[in-house]
Each structure stands twice: as structure tokens, then as C-alpha cells.
Regions:
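Oxidizing extracytosolic/periplasmic lumen-facing domains
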Residues: 2-296
């Protein structure tokens, strides 16, 4: 077995060590929530500037395909400008910057709220919101600069060239996607904050017990290549044994073995949180490829 404290970890691996494995007695998959020791309950305000910046980059990047390829340039001169090789080259560079910025939005969202569902919604909103915005601006600009031009969706099928209407439909699709993400975001943030508040409260006010991992069952499913398990944790309260079922998400090289020491936090409200006791020298499954996702 591999000892958790064996060797020194590189700085880039520290976050991986602190957050995995992740346990939840109430949620599973993307709704599982973490709160690192010493962190406060997450806030959305610090993410807004990053979200707006990422969306703006996607809008700038999307102006080229929407304007030059999807017929949404308001004038022939702007169409030529957007289709110029230099403009296309700049758009490609902006695309890479936008991808990096979107990754930063995801990482910062995870840092704030500790939940992949919330992080995914923030990053999705940055992409779809930016593309929907530029499509809307170009569509409005084109229609106002040429009010006599009819807007007919049938042109998508009948026009010999790529019509404005096709770009409008693509833009509307991104707008719908962005609206769905935006509508789901407040509830997801509230859920993550409640879970983090529970964890924070249990660490300060809850009763702490030493437990043991007595069952680890692989569900044969993964979330972003991270295997998902159902587990059972046994602990003793006033001489009586108790069992806590939980979901676990981890990496294939950090699957704790049966018998690993656990920390169980509970309160009078019936809220329970479990964590792996890394300080005790937890042992992990030695076959690191056992739970890796198959290529097929």
C-alpha cells in the first residue's frame, strides 16, 4: 500500500491533495461540495470581473465567424475587414486567451464554491454569453443599417449563400444556452453555499468522532475522469456503533482502502460530514490503473 505521507509533493499537486478524495453524505456527482480548512463560504462577487472579461474575449473572438462566415457583417467593408487574414489571425490568438480565461473562471469558481456544477455553469455562461452578445450586436447593427432588408428564416434553406438568418439562429441558440445557465446559477450557488456553511459550522461547533472506512464500492462511473464510489463509514457514539453511507469522488491514484481512518462530524440537527484523516497516514489502492476510465 502507498502511504499518504510518502515523499514530498510538488506545489502544483497541493490542491489535488487537499481536495481529493471528496465525500458527501447528501449529494453526488457534480453537486458534491467541498470547503478547504480555513476557507470561508464562497461569494460570487469576486468572480464577476473574471466572468465579464472572459465573455468579452469570447465576444471579440466570435465576431469573426459570425460576421465573416455567417453573414452578419453590417456592411461589405466590415465583412472584408473581419475576413482579412490579419483579423483572423488576431481572432485565433484571442481564442486561446479566451480559453485560458475560461479555465481561470472555472478554477476560481471551484476555489470559491468547491462544486463542479457551479464552476461549470460559470464557465458555460462566459462562453455562451459572450457569443450570444456579439451575435445580438451584429444582428441589430445589420438590421438597423439596412431597414429595408427582410428577415426571413426560409432564406436558410433557399439562399445560395450563407444568409444573415443562419447567424441569427446560431446566436439565438447560444443565447438560449446562456439563459439556461444563468437561470440555474443562483440556485446552484445557494446550494453550494448551504453545503459549505454546514461544513464550516460542523468544523467549529459539531461533535467529532474517529471512524473507519468499512466499504468502498465502485459505481463504474466517472466525472471528468474521476471515479465515483459509494462508501460506508463506521464510528462509535456512546458505545453504540453507527454507519454513515456517503458518496466519494477521487482520482484513480487516491482511492482509500477499506480500514482507512476517517473523521466524522455531526450535530444535533442530524447533519453529518465525513473526511479522510490524512494526518493518520491514510493508505490508497496500490493499483493506480484499477479505476481509470477505459478508452472505449
Amino acid at each position: 500500500m502507498r502511504d499518504a505521507g510518502e515523499g514530498k509533493q510538488k506545489h502544483g499537486q497541493q490542491e489535488h491533495i487537499e481536495t481529493l478524495p471528496l465525500f458527501s453524505t447528501t449529494d453526488k456527482n457534480g453537486r458534491m461540495t467541498m470547503l478547504r480548512p480555513g476557507r470561508r463560504v464562497g461569494r460570487a462577487a469576486p468572480l464577476i470581473p473574471w466572468l465579464i472579461t472572459a465573455a468579452a474575449l469570447w465576444a471579440l473572438t466570435g465576431s469573426v465567424p459570425f460576421g465573416a462566415l455567417l453573414g452578419m457583417a453590417p456592411t461589405p467593408a466590415i465583412n472584408m475587414l473581419l475576413g482579412h487574414p490579419v483579423t483572423v489571425g488576431v481572432a485565433v490568438l484571442l481564442l486561446f486567451v479566451a480559453i485560458v480565461m475560461t479555465g481561470a473562471v472555472y478554477s476560481l469558481s471551484m476555489e470559491q464554491f468547491g462544486q463542479t456544477r457551479v464552476a461549470g455553469l460559470f464557465s458555460t455562461l462566459s462562453v455562451t454569453g459572450g457569443l450570444a452578445a456579439v451575435a445580438g450586436v451584429l444582428l441589430l447593427w445589420t438590421l438597423t443599417s439596412n431597414p429595408s432588408r427582410p428577415f426571413d428564416l426560409e432564406a436558410i434553406a433557399t439562399s445560395p449563400t450563407i444568409p444573415l438568418e443562419l447567424g441569427a439562429v446560431v446566436g439565438a441558440s447560444f443565447a438560449l444556452w446562456a439563459a439556461i445557465a444563468l437561470l440555474r446559477l443562483p440556485g446552484s450557488i445557494a446550494h453550494a453555499r448551504r453545503r459549505q456553511a454546514d461544513i464550516e459550522r460542523l468544523r467549529v461547533e459539531g461533535s467529532s468522532y474517529t471512524g473507519a472506512l468499512t466499504a468502498v464500492n465502485f459505481t463504474n462511473s466517472w466525472l471528468f475522469n474521476l471515479p465515483i464510489f459509494t462508501v460506508e463509514v463506521n464510528y462509535i457514539v456512546d458505545g453504540a456503533p453507527r454507519v454513515v453511507p456517503a458518496h466519494m469522488r477521487t482520482s484513480d491514484d487516491r482511492v482509500p482502502v477499506v480500514g482507512s481512518r476517517m473523521i466524522v462530524l455531526t450535530d444535533d440537527r442530524g447533519t453529518t460530514h465525513v473526511e479522510l484523516d490524512l494526518a493518520s497516514g491514510a493508505a490508497f489502492e496500490p493499483d493506480v490503473g484499477k479505476y481509470a476510465p477505459s478508452d472505449g
